[in-house]
Structure formats: structure tokens, C-alpha cells
């Protein structure tokens, strides 16, 4: 059991002070001012106790948040793993699933993309389920709608990779150019981008992200864990190994 020594010292200091007050006057009861002065003097002598208190609070919040997230993952596993509207890259029957919430305009999402690709190349038992989460503005929404529309033409993976490689904001013109490069039907793509079905997918993804406690992109779900931020290949492999038996 971890003991917070500064707070133990504060308790001892207060007991000593109270003992002195009672020695001077057996009927004396420490006043609010007496207690405040003791605490103030102690904190001035031990300022590190404030930092320790903040760190302890943050760690407690982190653990509680992780526990809530783990429970939410279990309760929403079907939406995470079996939603037919979520594009998948890798063998659809692969035993290990990684769910990624991402935004095409997110720099860290772009940074981790080559790592995700390498992971899929080296680990054929892994599939990545993509949850479009456009949180960074109109260009993000445009890109996500285009990617989901491209999925209807069987071209999600190449369109996804090209969107992540776009230099600068993702505009309607950029999407038209990518559509032409991949030989897709532009008129159909535009129709699907504006369809209620695509809009509903994005709304559903946002609600799911909120339920799980996703606060940033990229965020990954591996097993029962929600992991925010970009990771290197070794970290992905560690998490896969840790969760492969679940």
C-alpha cells in the first residue's frame, strides 16, 4: 500500500499543534483559523505535496476513465467489430481486429498510416476496421463522405490511402482528381457522398466515439483497450500480443 508521507507529516503536525493548544488551555478547541494556518505553513514547507495531490488525482481520473471505456467497449463490441458499413482493410476473417477512429485532416493520423500499412503487411492475422470520425472541419467531412462513397465502388482502400497522402486541405477538386486517377464513376461518387446512408454512418460513428470516450484522433481499440494517439510498430505488436487471447 502506497503511503503519502507529506500528508502523514501534516497529520502529525496538526496533532502536535492541537496537543500544544490543549496543554495551554484544556478547554481550547482549534479554530478554523488555527487549522488554516497549520495547513498553510505545512504547504509552504512542503510545496511538493500539491503536485503529488494533482498527480494522484490525474492518475485516479485516468484509471476511472479507462475502466468506463473498457466497459463501453464490451457493451458495444458488435458495433465495433461487426458493422457492415465500416470499411475493413486486411483479411475480413483475420482473428485480430484493430478499430481505428480517424480524421483525414489529422496530422497524427497521416503519420501513423504507414505504420498501419506495414502492420497489415507483416501480420496477415490482423484486420483494421476504419471508423471515419471527421472532427476537424468541413474538409474532414468532405473527405470522409468521399471515402465512404468510394467504398460503394469497391475502392475504399486505395482511395483511403490517396486521401491520407493529399498535400494540404482536401478539396472537392482534389477528390475529383483522385476519383479520376482510380477510374471511379464521379457522378455516382457525388450521389453517394450526399446520400442519407453515408450521413447516417458518420452520425453513428460520432455517437459510438462519444460512448467509448474517444477524445482525439487517431484512437485505436484493440481487445478491451482504447488507446489514443499514434503508435510505432512495436507498440502495436505488443498490444496485439497482449489481446490476442481475448
Residue ranges and their predicted role:
Residues 34, 38, 45, 49-52, ...:
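Extracytoplasmic/secreted proteins, especially bacterial periplasmic and envelope-associated proteins
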Residues 2-24, 93-122:
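Gly/lys/ser-thr-rich phosphate-binding loops in alpha/beta enzymes
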Residues 41-42, 47, 79, 86-87, ...:
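Flexible, active-site-adjacent loop/turn segments at secondary-structure boundaries
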Residues 5, 24-40, 60, 177-246:
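C-terminal cap of thioredoxin/glutaredoxin-like
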Residues 78-96, 120-121:
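A short beta-strand-turn-helix
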Residues 83-87, 114-115, 206-207:
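A generic local structural motif
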Residues 99, 104-105, 110-185, 190, ...:
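Structural alpha/beta surface segment adjacent to cysteine/selenocysteine redox centers
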Residues 2-3, 12, 16-78:
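N-terminal targeting signals for export/organelle localization
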Amino acid at each position: 500500500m502506497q503511503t503519502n508521507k507529506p500528508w502523514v507529516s501534516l497529520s502529525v503536525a496538526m496533532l502536535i499543534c492541537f496537543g500544544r493548544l490543549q496543554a495551554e488551555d484544556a478547554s481550547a478547541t482549534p479554530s478554523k483559523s488555527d487549522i488554516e494556518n497549520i495547513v498553510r505553513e505545512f504547504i509552504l514547507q512542503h510545496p511538493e505535496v500539491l503536485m503529488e495531490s494533482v498527480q494522484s488525482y490525474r492518475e485516479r481520473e485516468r484509471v476511472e476513465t479507462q475502466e468506463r471505456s473498457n466497459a463501453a467497449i464490451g457493451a458495444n463490441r458488435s458495433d465495433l467489430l461487426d458493422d457492415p458499413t465500416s470499411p475493413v482493410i486486411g483479411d475480413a476473417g483475420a482473428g485480430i481486429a484493430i478499430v481505428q477512429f480517424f480524421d483525414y485532416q489529422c496530422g497524427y493520423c497521416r503519420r501513423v498510416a504507414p505504420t498501419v500499412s506495414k502492420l497489415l503487411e507483416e501480420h496477415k492475422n490482423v484486420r483494421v476496421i476504419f471508423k471515419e470520425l471527421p472532427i476537424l472541419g468541413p474538409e474532414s467531412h468532405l473527405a470522409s463522405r468521399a471515402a465512404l462513397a468510394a467504398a460503394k465502388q469497391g475502392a475504399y482502400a486505395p482511395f483511403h490511402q490517396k486521401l491520407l497522402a493529399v498535400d494540404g486541405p482536401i478539396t472537392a477538386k482534389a477528390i475529383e482528381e483522385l476519383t479520376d486517377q482510380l477510374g471511379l464513376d464521379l457522378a455516382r461518387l457525388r450521389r453517394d457522398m450526399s446520400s442519407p446512408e453515408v450521413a447516417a454512418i458518420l452520425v453513428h460513428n460520432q455517437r459510438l466515439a462519444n460512448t467509448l470516450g474517444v477524445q482525439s484522433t487517431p484512437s485505436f481499440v484493440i481487445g478491451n483497450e482504447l488507446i489514443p494517439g499514434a503508435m510505432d510498430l512495436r507498440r502495436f505488436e505488443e498490444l496485439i500480443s497482449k489481446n490476442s487471447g481475448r
